[in-house]
Amino acid sequence: MRYRHIASALALMLFSATACSSDTVNERAPKTAAEAGQAAYLANCAACHQPDGAGLAGAFPPLKGSDWLTSQSAEALIAAVLTGLSGPMTVSGKDYNGVMPAMSHLSDADIAAILSYVNSGINSGGDAISAEQVAAVRASSGTSADPAQGQAHPGTSQAQAAYEGAPSGVAGVEVKQVRTPGAPDMSEAEFTAASEIFFQRCAGCHGVLRKGATGKPLTPDITQAKGTDYLKALINFGSPAGMPNFGTGGELSAEQVDLMARFLQHTPPNPPEWGMPEMLASWKILVPEAERPTRQMNNYKLENIFSVTLRDSGEIALIDGDSYEIINIIKTGYAVHISRISHSMRYVYTIGRDGKIDLIDLWMPVPERVAEIKIGLEARSVETSKFPGYEDKIAIAGAYWPPQYVMLDGPSLEPLKIVSTRGMTVDTQEYHPEPRVAAIVGSHEHPEFIVNVKETGRILLVDYSDIDALKVTTLDAARFLHDGGWDVTKRYFLTAANQSDKIAVVDSREQKMVGLIDVDKIPHPGRGANFIHPQYGPVWGTSALGNANITLIGTDPDGHPDQAWKVVEVLQGQGGGSLFIKTHPQSRNLWVDTPLNPDAAMAQSIAVFNLDDLDAGFEVLPIAEWANLGEGPKRVVQPEYNRDGSEVWFSVWNGKDQRSAIVVVDDRTRTLKAVIDDPRLITPTGKFNVYNTAKDVY
C-alpha cells in the first residue's frame, strides 16, 4: 500500500491521481519513450485522472483537452509536479478544488516521460519535456529527490503512509449494525465483513470511529454526499483524500470495493468498550508470587539479555547478549510494540497491538510468563514505576481503543484503576471521542507516569502515590503526540508531536512544560539519542519519517543556556523513512535507520555518523547484505546497543514466510561480528536490552 497540483492544473490534474502507487502496472518493460511515459502515467496518475485522462467529474480535473494545460509553460508544469498544487481552480469551464500532492520523489526521467505523454499521448501536438529540464527546475527550487518525501496523498509521505497504515487491533471484534437513513442497504453479514475490512485496512489512518486521524474523516454526512460511485472510484484507484489504491493495488476485490463504498455511508459501528469486568475476565496469574523464585535461578547475565519482538508470530525471543543463543521463545500478544523492564531488571512487560500484556520473570530457570491481562482491544504502551520506594510496584498501560490508561499492580498485573482519555483537543478545544494513548515513561523525579495522549495533544503527569485518590496534572503540548525519551539527566522528557512537526519538552522535576520546538518533517525519535556535541554541549537527537533530517536539540540550560531547547544543528542522513536513532555513553557513533524508505538500498542499510566529526557525513553499512537472507524486503530496523556499548544489534525484518535475522556489529570498528540466523526468528523488529531499557540509556 503506497500513498502518493502542478503549479496550476496539470499538477493537480495530472497527479492527484497518484494514489495508484509507484508500482508499475505494466508487466512488460516499455520499448519506446512513449510506452515508458504511458506506463509511468498509469502507475502514478491514472487513479484519479483515469487511464484516458478524462478525470472524474466533480473530483479530479481532466487532462485530455484541458485548457489549463495549454496555458502553462513547461517550467510551470514541472514545478507543479515537484511541489504540488492546492486551492480552487477552473479547468475547461468547471471548478475544482486542487489537491495535487508533491511528486518530488519521482525521478527526473519519470516526470519528463509523464509530462511528455500527457502533452502528446493523451493530447496531441504538445512539446516533449526532457529529464534535463526537470533537473534544472528541481535544482532551482531546491526540491529534494528523497523518495520518502513523495506524497500519494497531500500531507502523507510515503514513509508515514507505511507507518500509519498498520492494521488496527480492533479487527475481529463483534460490532452492532446501525442502519443509517440515506445509506445503501446492507445485510448484517455484509456489515460485519465490511467492519472487519475497515478495522484491518483503514482504521489506522481514519480512526476506529472514522472521525479522522492521519487520514480524513469518513462520517456519513461526508460520504453520503459523495455517493457510491464516487467512493468506489476512490477506494479502487486511490485518491488525494487519503485512500490508497486498494482495488488496483490488489488489496480488495471488485466486490469488496463495492461493499466498502456502501459501508462508509453508514454510521460507524462502535467497537465494545473494555472496562474492569472485561479486564478481570482476561487476567490470569500463571505463577503466583509465592511460587516464584526468591533469587535468580539461572546463570544468564540478566543485564545483557535482549527481548526481541517477533512481530507476525505473536511472540518474543529472549536472546543471551553474550552467547547470541536464544534462551526462550515466548508466546505473547500479537505484534508486541514494546518491551519494558522493571527497575530491578527481574521482570519484562510486553504489550501487543491487541492490548495483551504479558509479564515474564527472568529469575526462573528458563524465563517464562507468570501473568497476563488484556487492557483493551488495541494498545501500544506499558511502563513500570521507577521512583525510589515504588520500584517494581506499579505498572501502567495505555490503549488506543478504548482510549484509556490502566493502573496495575506490578508483580501480578491486577487491574487497579481505569482512566478514560476522551476530552478536548489542545488547539481547537473540541471534544475528541478517540484520543489514543501513545508513549508512557516513568518519572525519575516524582512518583509519576508521564502519559502522551495523541489526538488531544495533552501530556498527563499521573501521580501513582495514591491510586485511590489519583492526582493528574495536565500539560498542554501539541496534537498527535507519539514517542520520546529523556535527556541525559533524566529530568527533561522530549517527545514528538509528529504530525504537528514539533518536539514537546517537559520538566519532570517542576512538573511543567518547557516549550515546543519546531522541527521538520514528521519526527520519529523512538527514545532519541543523547550525546555531547563538540560545539553545543549536551544534545538530544531525533530522525524523521518525512525527510532525511537528523535534528539535534540542546538540552543543557545550565551549562549552555543559549542553545537550550533550540535546534542547534540538522544533519542529513540517507533519507526519510527513519524510525530509530541510537547512540550509547560508551560509543562515538550515531546510528540512524531508514526501514520505511521506498528505496530498497536505504531500507536495507544503516547510516552511521562519527560523533567527533559530524561534518564528515555518514558511512553506509550493508546490514541486509551481511545477513545473506535471499529474497524479501529485508528492512533494517532499530539499532540497539548491548549492555556495555561495544555492540549494536539490528533486525533484518523480512516477510513472515521469508528468512529474517539479527545482525550484530562491532561499534568501534563498524564491522560484522555475528549474524543470528534462526528459523524461529520470524519478523524480528524491536529489540530491548534489559539494562539499557530499565535504566533509560540511549
Each predicted region: which residue ranges?
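Bacterial N-terminal signal peptides that target proteins for export
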Residues: 1-7
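C-terminal motif of bacterial Sec signal peptides marking the signal peptidase cleavage site
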Residues: 16-19
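Predominantly soluble domains enriched in secretory-pathway, periplasmic, or organellar proteins
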Residues: 21, 157, 162-175, 181-189, ...
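Electrostatic cytochrome c docking/interface patches
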Residues: 21-41, 55, 59, 130, ...
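Sequence/structural segment immediately N-terminal to covalent heme-attachment motifs in c-type
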Residues: 30-56, 65, 69-83, 150-154, ...
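Conserved beta-strand positions that form and line the central face of beta-propeller blades
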Residues: 52, 62, 99-102, 209, ...
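Extracytoplasmic electron-transfer domains, predominantly the class I c-type cytochrome c fold
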Residues: 64-128, 164-166, 184, 204, ...
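Aromatic- and Gly/Pro-enriched helix-to-coil junctions and flexible linker segments
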Residues: 117, 128-129, 137-156, 252-255, ...
